[in-house]
């Protein structure tokens, strides 16, 4: 498993392919920047150069661009508000970029992104179910026990089966996370028995 632009592990590579990672980032942005989900737009950007952008009331846009290197974001989070030289970092050469491509995601093709928006907008315990079920389904895929498209199918089944808790405690969230993981395993075991 290799992402075309980013150097990352197998789990996040799968989450990137399904767009579950993008869905989780949408939820993060909602809480970090105190904005509504309708104000957050996801774009498919194959070159992985523009990492985020903010549109202001006057319609001007400020974006954060750089080479696809997660070390930069991690370093900045650790050294904020200072910016430090990135060891072995590669500068972005704008003259070599050519063109940048942006597309709206197909929410039918990337159903995981729809599930993440649904979980985020519903709130309560549903984002925890989405995350726990995805963690288990992703693992099962990497172990060769399910097909790629079953990842989002299993997550959706877990979300549909879950009884929402509006204001869960930390202990409840831990239990719900385990429930979601167990639900996915149970679904796979029942499917195998039927075959």
Across the structure, where does each feature detected by a protein language model lie?
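Catalytic, metal-anchored helix/loop core of enzyme active sites in primary metabolism
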Residues: 1-195
């Amino acid at each position: 498993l290799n992402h075309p632009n980013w150097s990352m592990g197998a789990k996040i590579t799968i989450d990137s392919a399904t767009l579950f990672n993008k869905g989780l980032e949408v939820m993060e942005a909602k809480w970090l920047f105190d904005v509504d989900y309708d104000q957050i737009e996801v774009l498919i950007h194959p070159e992985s150069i523009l990492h985020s952008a903010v549109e202001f009331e006057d319609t001007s846009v400020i974006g954060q661009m750089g080479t696809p290197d997660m070390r930069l974001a991690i370093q900045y989070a650790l050294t904020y508000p200072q910016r430090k030289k990135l060891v072995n970092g590669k500068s972005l050469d704008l003259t070599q970029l050519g063109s940048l491509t942006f597309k709206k995601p197909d929410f039918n093709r990337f159903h995981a992104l729809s599930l993440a928006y649904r979980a985020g907008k519903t709130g309560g315990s549903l984002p925890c179910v989405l995350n726990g079920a995805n963690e288990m389904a992703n693992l099962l895929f990497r172990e060769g026990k399910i097909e790629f498209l079953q990842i989002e199918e299993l997550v959706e089944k877990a979300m549909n089966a879950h009884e929402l808790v509006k204001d869960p405690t930390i202990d409840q969230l831990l239990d719900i996370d385990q429930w979601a993981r167990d639900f996915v395993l149970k679904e796979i075991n029942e499917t195998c028995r039927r075959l």
